[in-house]
Amino acid sequence: MILENELLQLALGMAQAVLLLLCAPLVTGIIKKVKAWMQNRIGSSIWQEYYDIRKWWGKPTMLTPYTSITFRLAPCVYFLTTFAAACMLPGFLGGQTGFGDVFVFVYLLALGRFFMAVSSLDAATAFGGMGGSREVYVAAFVEPVVMLAVLSNVLHTNSTSLAGMSLRTDEVNLTVAGVLTCIAFFLVLLAENSRIPVDNPDTHLELTMIHECMTLEYSGRLLALIHWASQLKLLVFLVLFAMLYLPLDLPVVFKVLIGAVAVGVVETMNNKMRLFKVRVYLAAAGLMLLLAVVAQ
């Protein structure tokens, strides 16, 4: 009976992840549409990300003969680890899934980032190596702040399960510590997903790129997997932000849309900061989380 229940929860979690995977390009399209409206532009269709993925999927994959198997496997690992993290989220279809431990969730995403950084070095190109080194530099500051956000929520809810955290989120988010954690996690969300002000996902200037530098040598289906996984990762963080940190009594779908609009607004009102100022930005988020932990 217990095994059947666990298998059911796993199946529901995978169904939820598939739903998020299908909706991820739409959320990215909505963010771009919000940015276009705020800049008095018409902008591309909210369905444009689907067209781009279909375009890349139909093109051949060109690989240099000097790359190893790591270069080919990295997009698949990045995609699968992000999909596995999406399976662990509570809510939507799976109710309160019991296998979503927050530490496993964090390090699944870190594993995907590690493989992408290694693959950028594997191509032995100047821009790829630069992007990989910058990604690792940012990750060195992001990961401790993410763990502080996790610690703050664990202390609030007395649980490391994402499901357990979501059950007690209403009573937590109305406190001063909850508001500080909400703001800090939103700042971490932008940094973790390479959004402005930490990185610009739409830039064409190689010298200012971080995440996009690591994808310059990819093409075809491997490039489609990378972009799709990045869009899914952004949606996963928005769902997590909506379920655990956003203090609004609304359905999760509406809170995710509010988070997506907030990302678009913040990106429009800010410029990309210099690389060496990222640590100050993340230090501010870390300080808010530390205050949230002390305030409990």
Give the positions of each predicted feature.
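Mid-bilayer segments of alpha-helical transmembrane spans in multi-pass integral membrane proteins
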Residues: 104-119, 140-157
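Alpha-helical transmembrane segments
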Residues: 12-24, 96-110, 170-192, 241
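Transmembrane alpha-helix boundary signature
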Residues: 83-100, 116-125, 155-160
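Alpha-helical transmembrane segments of helical membrane proteins, especially in multi-pass transport
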Residues: 215-249, 255-264
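Interfacial loop-to-transmembrane junctions
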Residues: 262-289
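Cytosolic, membrane-interface loops and tails of multi-pass inner-membrane proteins
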Residues: 38-64, 190-223
